[in-house]
């Protein structure tokens, strides 16, 4: 079945017609942005390793933290990360030899997109996510980024609170409609 992405720039009657035809909201995402020119970078509280390329440690930890077990996903996802055009910043936090946090910054002109912020369940609420974001934002700013954006699943209040504490502000919401 077809899946439609709906955003505030679209005529609201289209969304209404989809609803009337049995298309339900499947996923809602909030987009947040910040101006890095006025951002006062603070040092990360946890030690964050930054690399321009994906590592197997990073990828394996991402699969584990996401609960990814599908062998097809495990085969395809690495090629997607390797195919990212432009400069990337991969952030990793370790506890000994174990990866306990990941993050990704993708630089595009004067923007950095922040993605894949994950912290292992036993390490949450210890400022690790904040440290990852701080390290990515600082590095992106040093590489010429003036603005940052990210997407957060609507209802993920912990993540939204973290991003707001860093200076991100809500910009808009988009959602997907599909028939079930």
Locations of the language-model features?
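Conserved GNAT acetyl-CoA-binding A-motif
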Residues: 1-8, 140-151
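Conserved acetyl-CoA-binding loop-helix of GNAT-fold acetyltransferases
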Residues: 116-119, 125-138, 142, 161, ...
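Acyl-donor-binding surface of acyltransferase catalytic domains
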Residues: 1-46, 177-178
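C-terminal, charge/polar-rich interaction regions
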Residues: 112, 125, 129, 146, ...
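A conserved beta-strand-loop-helix scaffold within acyl/acetyltransferase catalytic domains
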Residues: 71-122
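Conserved active-site alpha-helix within GNAT-family acetyltransferase domains
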Residues: 11-25, 130, 154-173, 180
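Short amphipathic alpha-helix that is part of the acyltransferase structural core
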Residues: 29, 40-75, 94
């Amino acid at each position: 079945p077809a899946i439609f992405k709906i955003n505030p720039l679209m005529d609201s009657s289209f969304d209404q017609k989809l609803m009337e035809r049995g298309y339900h909201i499947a996923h809602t995402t909030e987009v947040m942005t910040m101006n890095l020119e006025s951002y006062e970078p603070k040092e990360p509280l946890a030690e964050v390793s930054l690399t321009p390329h994906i590592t197997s440690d990073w990828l394996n930890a991402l699969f584990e933290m996401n609960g990814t077990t599908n062998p097809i996903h495990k085969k395809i996802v690495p090629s997607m990360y390797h195919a990212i055009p432009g400069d990337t910043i991969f952030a990793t936090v370790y506890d000994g030899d174990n990866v306990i946090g990941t993050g990704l910054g993708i630089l595009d002109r004067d923007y950095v997109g922040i993605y894949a912020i994950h912290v292992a369940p036993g390490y949450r609420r210890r400022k690790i996510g904040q440290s990852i974001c701080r390290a990515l934002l600082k590095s992106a700013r040093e590489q010429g980024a003036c603005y940052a954006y990210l997407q957060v699943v609507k209802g993920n209040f912990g993540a939204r609170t973290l991003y707001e504490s860093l200076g991100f502000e809500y910009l808009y919401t988009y959602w997907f409609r599909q028939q079930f």
